[in-house]
Amino acid sequence: MVERATEVVEPHTQLLRVTLEADNARAYWQRSTPGATAGDQEVEQAFVEFWFGARTMPRVRALIAAFRARFAAFPGALAALHAWPDMDRATRVLVCHWHLQLSDPLYRRFTGDYLVERRQGGRETVSRGPVIRWIAEVDDQGRWSASTRAQFASKLLSAAHSAGFVASIRDPRALTLPRVPAGALGYLMYLLRSVVFAGSLLDNPYLRSVGLAGSAVDDKLRTVAGLSCRRTGDVSEFTWDHDSLEDWVRHTRGSTA
């Protein structure tokens, strides 16, 4: 039985230090191994070998800590990503987006609920001011000061821009949706199969964030290699051709066939 991780539900401030960082994330998963995710040895190696270019030791430490939480914390993900060196950029950005959603509940709500609701409500833009007010609403326990909420708003919008959900870095920012390659969707489905999360495999903030809901999910899943889904009313049945995410990557390499 594949070990199952759980999406993170406790709010934290890691996003204030490390946003999406798709290029650095790729450098991490190409070089890191599951057995090297404890202690400072990997941090030292990343610094000496310039995994992330000419970064300071504190910055390398922050990146490694973030990427461990986003990728290494989910069984099989790091091995699967290491086995997919020729991943296209569109897929890589989405993989980083979904892993950030899994590991950060505020980013998950922002991209999977708040931005979705704005689109559905006919609002075509988003600005920093309304995002700050939204953060104040969801921070019902008063964890963060006004200045911290303002920092969160900037970082959320920056990450959303990098992921393809907003078109610019200046207000008002037009809402957009990234293209979802079949290989990216296949990765997400096999990943979620081994994760405990709120929702179902066909209805969740990970799919909603990229504009996939209802029949659009069914249509897109037909293009994904290595799995099939039959839905009858509210009942869905998945057929998985591979035992794990890593097996799926090794057999399909994100194929759209």
Predicted features by range, described:
Residues 1-102, 113-114, 126, 257:
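Eukaryotic partner-binding/assembly regions in large regulatory complexes
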Residues 28, 32, 94-124, 181-200:
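Positively charged, polyanion-binding regions of nucleic-acid-associated proteins
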Residues 55-62, 146-162, 210-223:
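Short amphipathic alpha-helical interaction segments
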Residues 90, 98, 174-213, 244-257:
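Short, amphipathic alpha-helical interaction segments positioned at domain boundaries
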Residues 121, 138-147, 170:
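Inter-helical turn/loop segments and adjacent helix faces that build the functional surface
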Residues 125-142:
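DNA-recognition alpha helix
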Residues 161-171, 225-231:
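A short, conserved structural fragment
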Residues 225-226, 231-257:
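Long, low-complexity, charge-rich intrinsically disordered regions
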